[in-house]
Structure formats: C-alpha cells, structure tokens
Amino acid sequence: MEKFLDINEIKRIIPHRYPFLLVDKITELEEGKSAVGYKNVTVNEYFFNGHFPEEPVMPGVLIIEALAQVGAVAILSKEEFKGKIAYFGGINKAKFRKKVVPGDELKLSIELTKIKGVAGVGKAVATVDGKVAAEAELLFVIGK
C-alpha cells in the first residue's frame, strides 16, 4: 500500500523536530516494509554555517540520520510498533559517493530486510538526480 505523508503526519510518527527533523515528506510507504522520503536541501540549513562556509556540503552523518528517520517511519508504521520510538541501533557498510549541496533534492529510500522482536535492519540509499549520494545498512531498536 502506497501512502503520502506530509510533515505533520511525519511528526505524529517520529519525535524529531526542527532543527533535527531531516525529512520533508514521505511519498511511498509500505507499512513495516519500506518507505521513500525527500529532504529539500537549502542554503539556509543550520549546518552549512560551519560545514563548510565557502563550499557548503551536507555532512554525511546527517544524510545517514535522514535515512534513519525515513526508516523509523517505515518500521513504526508496523501495527505492533505504532506509538513507540525507533532508536538508531547501528550502521554497517556505509558509503558516501556524491556531495549533497544546497539546491539538491535528496531522495531517501529504505527497505526493511529483517525484523525480529524489537530489532530491525534496513537497506538505505540516498540519491540526488538518480545518482547515489550515500548508502548503508541501518539497524533499529524499538523502545517504549
């Protein structure tokens, strides 16, 4: 089932808020299985003040965080996890392949490959204009 979530609906699912909410919308959601979201990267992002003033580049760790937030929406849409919190449990095989700069639309995709008990694993890919910017395997742990 595909579903569109605006920023207000995202905020009902995950606890992140400005300046750390890094997802603007979810355009596809298969509950408990996968999600696709977007972050419109603007020159006004707080992190560009120091990373780097003369050549702004979105920090890779924040690209991973944006992917984790989309993953949290995917896993928390599973009926048994609704109303809970998803913690970032770990990262494997992270690769950064392209700079993300002001003006980019960052497409954030995750497919949950395994859920066992209160833990999950997802394959995450961030792209800009169809080119991979970052990819990683993300681990989630569900809290109360």
Swiss-Prot record:
Molecular function as annotated in GO: (3R)-hydroxyacyl-[acyl-carrier-protein] dehydratase activity
Keyword entries, A-Z: Cytoplasm, Lipid A biosynthesis, Lipid biosynthesis, Lipid metabolism, Lyase
One Pfam family of this chain: FabA
EC category: lyase
Gene Ontology process terms (BP): fatty acid biosynthetic process; lipid A biosynthetic process
GO (cellular component) term, any one: membrane
SUPFAM superfamilies named among the record's database cross-references: Thioesterase/thiol ester dehydrase-isomerase (SSF54637)
Classification via InterPro entries: FabA_FabZ (IPR013114), FabZ (IPR010084), HotDog_dom_sf (IPR029069)
EC number, UniProt record: 4.2.1.59
Record field: transmembrane: none
Catalytic site: H51
Subcellular location per the Swiss-Prot or TrEMBL entry: Cytoplasm
Catalytic activity: a (3R)-hydroxyacyl-[ACP] = a (2E)-enoyl-[ACP] + H2O
Sequence similarity: Belongs to the thioester dehydratase family. FabZ subfamily.
Known role: Involved in unsaturated fatty acids biosynthesis. Catalyzes the dehydration of short chain beta-hydroxyacyl-ACPs and long chain saturated and unsaturated beta-hydroxyacyl-ACPs.
UniProt name for this protein: 3-hydroxyacyl-[acyl-carrier-protein] dehydratase FabZ
Taxonomic source organism: Clostridium botulinum (strain Okra / Type B1)
Gene that specifies this protein: fabZ
